[in-house]
Amino acid sequence: MPDREDGPVLVRRKPFADERRAFARIFCAEALAEIGWPGPVAQINHSRTERAGTLRGMHYQRPPYAEAKLVVCIRGAVHDVAVDVHDDSPARYSHVGVELSAEAGTAIYVPEGFAHGFQALPDDAELIYIHSVAY
């Protein structure tokens, strides 16, 4: 992870499974506040990337529109990247790359001041984005 106390955090969701299939929490304000979630949810988006190898990003908003986001993989897998773009950061342009997958139940918290993007690993990768600021 980048050399910042307030950097990206890999989140491992804990699904509950039984004979009916599975249930997993996507967002919990109390749990995410512990890792820096700044406040209310302003927008939730869904993306589907049809072809393996497709790159999407790098996206970020500068103040006063800076946003935090929780990126959750709900189908397939992606190589997800967050880049520190804070003007005053000694770690500026450092990055973290992690694999997010629906099977592993992984997500990433991307705080304000980080650009975000990903590359789809298999065909038909799907992500849910939870944003702190509306786009």
State the predicted function of each range.
Residues 81, 108, 116-121:
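Short beta-strand His + acidic residue motifs that chelate non-heme Fe in jelly-roll/DSBH
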Residues 1-103, 122-124, 131-135:
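Non-catalytic, conserved peripheral segments adjacent to functional cores
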